[in-house]
Amino acid sequence: MRNKHKDKKYKQAAQIVGGMSMKYILELGKSSSNLIGKFSSSVLFFCVFLVACHEKGSIERPLPTSETVSQLAEQSYRLDNSKIRKQLDLLARADRDSLVADSRTRRYYRDGGNLLWIDRFGVDKRADSLLAYLNTVEEMGFSKRVFVVGQIERDLQRIRTLDVDTGIRDVNRVMARLEYNLTKAFLRYTAGQHFGFTNPKQIFNNLDIREQDSVRTTYRGLFDIHVKRPTKDFYTTALRKVYNDSVDIFLRQVQPQNALYALLIKHFKGKDLSEADRIRLLCNVERSRWRQTDYPQNHRKYVLVNVPSYHLDAIEGDSVLTMRMACGTLDTKTPLLNSHIMRMDVNPQWIIPRSIIKKEVVGHAGNPDYFERHRYFILNRSSGRRVDPANVSAGMLLNPDYFVIQEGGEGNSLGRVVFRFNNNFSIFIHDTSSKWAFDRGSRSVSHGCIRVQKPFELAVFLLGKKDKTLIDKINYSMQADLSKPKEGEEKRTRVDYRRLVNSVKVNPNVPLFITYYTLYPDVKGKMHTYADVYGYDKVLYRYLRSFSI
C-alpha cells in the first residue's frame, strides 16, 4: 500500500503543476501504462521522480520540491512523442547486430510498436528488474556490454537526476535510447536464457563434410537432439509481458530448465578462472541452456553416455553402474541424441554398413580367405541366398542388392550382445571383440557405435524384472560357442539350445542420453573436467566469443 504521508506530497506536487499553463498538465491519476504516444506531441516531463508504490523491488525516487517543479517548464525537460519516435526509427535503422532478438527489436519499432518501458512517469521498476538479472551475466561468463548494461545505467541515471539538456543529452534522445536498449537487452536475454544463445543443429550439422562435388556439399549429422528454438510467438509474448508489467515474473520463467545449469553456475561463482576454465564454463553453460524435450533429471532410471568422459553410466535412483566405453573416431564421430533402449539381441549378426564396405571391404572382392577369416558372408537381398565370395566383384559389393554380413558369436565385431534404440544413424550400444580398446586413455576408435566394457551387467540393469532364469539364459548365451566346428578340431562341449536366448525386449524402455559435456558432475554432485575429444568446445566458442568477458 502507498504511504499516506507520501501520497499527500504527491498531491501537493500535482497542485503546483496544476497552476502552470494547461499546455503542461499531466494527469497523475491515470495508469502508468498510458504511454507517451497517447498524449499531445509535447508534454511536460516531471514524474521521473515519482514512484507508483512501495512494493518489494520498487525504486523510491525523491519527491520534487516546488523549486524543482518550477524548473520543469523549461524546454530541456519536455517529452515530445514525435521526437522520440524519430529517434527510435534512427536507432533501428542504424542497428546492424545479427541476432534474431535484434531483428525483432528493429522490426517492432520500425513498425510503430507501442512504447514499452517509458511513459509519463519516466522509467519505472521494470527496468530495474531487468538490470538486476543483466548484472549477473558475468557469473555465466558473459560480458555486460552484450546487453548494453553500461549505457542503460547511464541513461537511467540521467533521467532520474534530470541530467539532460537540449543538446546531446536531449531528454527525447535519452528516453528513446533507453526504450530501444531495454527492449533489445530484454529480448536478447530472455530468448538466450530460455533457448540458448546458439543453435546446435545449425552449428554441428554443418561441420563434417560427408560428400562434396561441384554442385553441392552434404554434411554428416552430428546433433540429433530435439531442441526448441524461439518463435515469433515467443517474442510477441515477451513484449506483451513488458507492456503488462510482468517483467520480473517472466524473467524467472525463462531461466534454463536443465538442472545442470544451476550446478555449473554455483560451482564457479566467485572463482578466479583461467582463460581455459572460463571458455570451458562458457561452452558448458550454453549446452545446459539448449531447451530439450527431455532431460535425465526427469527419470529415475536411465542410461547416460557423456562422450568426452569415455564412460557410460546406468543410473537407477541412487545406484550407479559405471563402465568404460569407446566411441567414434574424429572421422566417424558418435552422434549426439536422445532415445530409448528397446531391445537387446544376443549373439547378433552384423550387417556391415555401406560406408564400411566402401572403405574396408570392397578391396577384398573375390578373396574368399578374407571373408572366411572375418566370418563374413554375402547375401543376395532379393533371393535371400548366400553368394560364393570367390564370385563376387567390387561392383556387387557396392550394389545395395547385396549384403555383407558377419556371423554372430565369438569374434563378431558387435561382441555377444547389442542394445538397440531408435535413431537416424544406424548406431547402437554393443559388446566388442576388441577388448584392448578399454585399456586406452583415448577411446575414440569405433565407426560411430558405442562399445561397452560391461555388456552383461548392462543387460541385467536394463531388465524391468530381474528374472533369474532369464538372466541365466543371457549369461549362458553370451558364453556359448556357436561357431561351426573346423575339420580336425577337438570335440567341444555341446550347446544346450534350450538355454539360448536371441532377443530380449527392454520393458519398460529405458531412456538413453548421448551427450557432450567437458564439465559434468557425478551423482554426488562433484564436478569433473574432461578433454574436448571432438573439439566441440572450440567450435562452440567461435559462436560465443562475442558474448564473453
At which residue positions do the language-model features occur?
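Short His/Asp/Glu-rich catalytic/ion-coordination signatures at enzyme active sites or charged loops
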Residues: V164-V171, I209-L239
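Bacterial Sec-dependent N-terminal signal peptides
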Residues: M1-T65
